[in-house]
C-alpha cells in the first residue's frame, strides 16, 4: 500500500507512541524473571510482537489484556519441538538479544528472519557466543543460524561499534550463567544510551551490572525478579512529530518522561540547536515552526534520528553536517544511502559521507516517488518531508511504519496532515 502526501500545515495535540526499545526489554526480562510480570502500555508493533512470539515459543506464559501483557516467566527452555524455528521477522533487536538468551539454555535453538534481517550482520555476536562456549552454526555470519548451549560465563571480546544490540544481548543473558561474565569491548561503543537503557531495565528486575575498564561485568548468582513495568513514550518515534511541527506548524506531544534514559531524547536539544521553537513542561513537549539555521550534529549515540534530522537540515539556512552514524549502513536499509536518495529526489542539496551526510539549505522540495526499501524510518521521514513539498509525494510502502509506530499515519491525519493510503 502506498502513502500519498500533499503539502499541509499541522496543529494539535497527540500522545507519544509507546517506546519500542523499552517494550523489547520489558518482554525479555519478564520472560526471564520467576513469577508474574505485567507490562503496561506496551508497543504492539511488528518488532515487539516478534519478541513476544519468541518468548512464548521458548516457554513463557503470555496473556494479552487491555493495554497490558502479563508474562509468567522463569521457565525458558531449549530445545524446542522439532521443526520449531524462532522467526524474528525484521527485528534486529529481537534476534540479537534472543541469541544471547539461547546460548544460556540447555539445547539448540534455531533462528531466522525476513530477507532484510537475514542480510544484517550477526558475526560479531555469533563469534562472541562461540568464545563463551556456545555451539554456533551459520553459513555466512548472518541469519539463519543455530545456537546450542548452555554456556556458563567467562570472558568474551566483542566490537562495540557495529551494534549496541550485541552488547545488550550479552548483558541480558549473563545472569543465567553459573560463572561471572566479563564483556570486553575491542572498539569504542556506539549507541551507548541503548546499553545504558538495558542496564537500567536489568536493575529494575534486580540484576546489577558493573563497569570495568574496557566493558562490563555481570556477576553470577543473580536472579531476575518479577516486576510490573509501565512503558513510557518513544522519543525516536516522537522525533517525526517534532520535525513535522518544526517545519509545518505547532503541536504538543504528551507522555514523554524527561527522566527516561532513551538516548533519542537528545532530539529536543537538536531541535533547539537548529532554532525550532521548543517548550518543555514535564512530560509534555510543544514544538512550533521557526526559521531554522544549519548545525553540525553528532549522531553516534542517537543514529535512529538520522533520516528525520536530515530532513530538518534540508530546510536550515547554511550547511549542516550529520556525522558519527556509520553503523546505519547495517540497519533495515543502508539508512545513510536511503536518506540521501529520497531527499535528493525531492530537490535537497545533500551529499553522502562515510558516516553521515552534508546538507545545504533551505531547499525548495518537490514531491517525488520515494522508495523506502522497507525501512520504517525512511517511510516516516519522507512522509514528513512531503508536508512541505510543492507537489504530491508518493511513498512506496505505507505499512512499514508498523514496525515501530503503527499509528503514525492516523496521528498525522489527526494533526491535519494531508496523507492517505491507497
UniProtKB/Swiss-Prot annotation:
Its EC number is 2.5.1.19. It is found in: Cytoplasm. Transmembrane segments: none annotated. It is an enzyme of class 2 (transferase). Pathway: Metabolic intermediate biosynthesis; chorismate biosynthesis. 3-phosphoshikimate binds at residues 20-21, 25, 163-165, 191, 304, 331. Phosphoenolpyruvate binds at residues 20, 92, 120, 165, 335, 377. One of its GO terms (cellular component) is cytoplasm. It catalyses: 3-phosphoshikimate + phosphoenolpyruvate = 5-O-(1-carboxyvinyl)-3-phosphoshikimate + phosphate. Keywords: Amino-acid biosynthesis, Aromatic amino acid biosynthesis, Cytoplasm, Transferase. Catalyzes the transfer of the enolpyruvyl moiety of phosphoenolpyruvate (PEP) to the 5-hydroxyl of shikimate-3-phosphate (S3P) to produce enolpyruvyl shikimate-3-phosphate and inorganic phosphate. Belongs to the EPSP synthase family. This is 3-phosphoshikimate 1-carboxyvinyltransferase. It comes from Methanocorpusculum labreanum (strain ATCC 43576 / DSM 4855 / Z). The gene is aroA.
